[in-house]
Amino acid sequence: MTQEGQLEKRFLDYLHSERNYSEHTSTAYENDLSDFRRFLNEQAIIEYQQVTFLDVRIYLTELKQKSFSRTTVARKISSLRSFYTFLLRENVITENPFTYVSHAKNQLRLPKFFYSEEMEALFQVVYEDNETLTLRDRVILEVLYGTGIRVSECAGIMLSDLDTSYQAILIRGKGNKERYVPFGAYAEDAITDYLSGRIELMTRFKKTHDSLLINHYGDPLTTRGIRYCLTKIISKASLTRKIHPHMLRHTFATDLLNNGADMRTVQELLGHASLSSTQIYTHVTKEHLKSTYMKHHPRA
């Protein structure tokens, strides 16, 4: 491994062990470093210590010419700034060339959410029969919409994480932070109806694990597997616009705020470290109110 490769590995290990970053986040940093290393090779720059402010400006220009979104450019620069801050702390460099690099302010991108009639169409799909895998899909949909957890968090649910007496689930979120989220009667009924079929399927394939969600071989259902299940549900519901599974989380937050929930509670339920991450949903509700007004009021 080259010296530069060793520096990258030390940084990624630091993110994982000391900052408790998730594998998904660490992978994003690794990809950003890889892209920057490609750029440096093209510029015949061998060592990270050789990078100057001018080199950074050239790289920033290249990113913009490749039509990356402002959000992507901002993330890449943030990743590299963090990397060079780490190198500075480790006394590998004496000055961070990313310190004074600015980028265009991120555009406000409002989260997309499902409308009530779309949610009804999705639920119709998972309530059409009581086959074990349909019951599992029902659990996925009821839990994701009923709790607002991330798809990756849903994949990590163990039977031991379920507290049926309080109707709550122990969730391990980003940075391995734990939180309890409540779930309602629909999710509870879905889980209860599914568990006997889960046991039968696992017994058939001689599986012995604690994961709540399983695939057709009785193995734990992965994040990718849940996304695949949701994609099939969405397809069967014949929804016309372009949508994605994460919209269930957006819908959960939007529906809570539309029905009077306070911002701090929604923040806790979503597992957001910062209130600013939650406040984006107030823009969604305002836009929805305005759209409804403009569409239906005779003097709009």
UniProtKB/Swiss-Prot annotation:
Residues 2-88 form the Core-binding (CB) domain. GO terms for molecular function: DNA binding; tyrosine-based site-specific recombinase activity. Pfam families: Phage_int_SAM_1 (PF02899), Phage_integrase (PF00589). The active site is at R150, K174, H246, R249, H272, Y281 (o-(3'-phospho-dna)-tyrosine intermediate). Residues 109-294 form the Tyr recombinase domain. Gene3D superfamilies: 1.10.150.130, Intergrase catalytic core (1.10.443.10). One of its GO terms (biological process) is DNA transposition. Site-specific tyrosine recombinase, which acts by catalyzing the cutting and rejoining of the recombining DNA molecules. The XerC-XerD complex is essential to convert dimers of the bacterial chromosome into monomers to permit their segregation at cell division. It also contributes to the segregational stability of plasmids. This is Tyrosine recombinase XerC. It comes from Listeria innocua serovar 6a (strain ATCC BAA-680 / CLIP 11262).
